[in-house]
Structures are given as C-alpha cells and as structure tokens.
C-alpha cells in the first residue's frame, strides 16, 4: 500500500492590496502568524526587502517550509506551503495566508510528494490470505 510523505500547496494570489505585501515587516508577521495558526514547528526564517517594491520570506520548518515572494506593483503574491506529517497543517497555514491577504483571485495547486510503498510486517502468506478474503 502506498502512502504520501508530504503535501505541497502552491498558490498564486492576484489582486492583493499592495500595502499588505510591500513591506518585509508585514511579510514576516504574515508567515510567523501562519506557522502559529497551523501549529507548525519553526526552525529558522529569513526575509528580504526588495527595492523599490516587494519582499520575500521563507520559514524553515521541522515539517518542511513556507515561502512567499511578492510583487506589490502587480498585486501578486506567490506562496508555497510544504509539510510532511499531518496534511491539515498545510491547509491551515495556506488558509491563514489567503484570509489575511484577501486576494481577488487564487490559482492553487496541491501536490502529494514522496509517494512510497508502506512497509508491512505481514508475511507473504498473510498478505495472500487477506487478498483472498476480500474476493
């Protein structure tokens, strides 16, 4: 049986108020708020203010990462939320960011990452028996 190790949500947020995404201080507050809201585990973070407009930020998580890059002159923010473990935390973090930025349009993709075969402690005979019982 296969299982997914991570969930990666990517969103392009259009029509965002430029004042919400121009200053690195606001981007820091946004991402740190998303980490707390989703109950994620922050390891470190880095933020950068572009001139004349925009900011970028990344939060390294024990569960993976959250990042944002902004173009306030276009009302655009691109956001990545990637987590392993509980997928609901990725959705909570992204929902928090979207709610705070209140975009007019959202283009979102969700990708399951690291799909692997789950190890089983069953012997081959037990596996065959369970398959035959399903028939």
Curated annotation (Swiss-Prot):
- Description of post-translational modifications: Is synthesized initially as an inactive proenzyme. Formation of the active enzyme involves a self-maturation process in which the active site pyruvoyl group is generated from an internal serine residue via an autocatalytic post-translational modification. Two non-identical subunits are generated from the proenzyme in this reaction, and the pyruvate is formed at the N-terminus of the alpha chain, which is derived from the carboxyl end of the proenzyme.
Q: In which pathway does this enzyme or protein participate? A: Amine and polyamine biosynthesis; S-adenosylmethioninamine biosynthesis; S-adenosylmethioninamine from S-adenosyl-L-methionine: step 1/1
According to UniProt, residues marked as the site described as Cleavage (non-hydrolytic) are: 63-64
Catalytic activity as recorded in UniProt: S-adenosyl-L-methionine + H(+) = S-adenosyl 3-(methylsulfanyl)propylamine + CO2
Q: Which SUPFAM superfamilies match?
A: S-adenosylmethionine decarboxylase (SSF56276)
Q: Enzyme group, top EC level?
A: lyase
Q: Which family does it belong to?
A: Belongs to the prokaryotic AdoMetDC family. Type 1 subfamily.
What is this protein for, i.e. what is its function? Catalyzes the decarboxylation of S-adenosylmethionine to S-adenosylmethioninamine (dcAdoMet), the propylamine donor required for the synthesis of the polyamines spermine and spermidine from the diamine putrescine.
Description of how the protein assembles with itself and partners: Heterotetramer of two alpha and two beta chains arranged as a dimer of alpha/beta heterodimers.
Protein name, please?
A: S-adenosylmethionine decarboxylase proenzyme
**Source organism per UniProt:** Aquifex aeolicus (strain VF5)
């Amino acid at each position: 049986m296969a299982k997914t190790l991570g969930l990666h949500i990517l969103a392009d947020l259009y029509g965002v108020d430029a004042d919400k995404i121009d200053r690195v201080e606001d981007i820091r507050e946004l991402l740190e708020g998303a980490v707390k809201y989703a109950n994620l585990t922050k390891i470190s973070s880095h933020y950068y203010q572009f001139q004349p407009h925009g900011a970028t930020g990344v939060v390294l998580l024990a569960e993976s990462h959250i990042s944002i890059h902004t173009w306030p002159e276009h009302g655009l923010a691109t956001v990545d939320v990637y987590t392993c473990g509980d997928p609901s935390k990725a959705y909570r973090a992204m929902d928090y960011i979207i709610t705070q930025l209140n975009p007019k349009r959202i283009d979102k993709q969700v990708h399951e990452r690291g799909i692997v075969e789950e190890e089983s402690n069953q012997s081959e005979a037990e596996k065959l028996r369970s398959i035959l019982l399903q028939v």
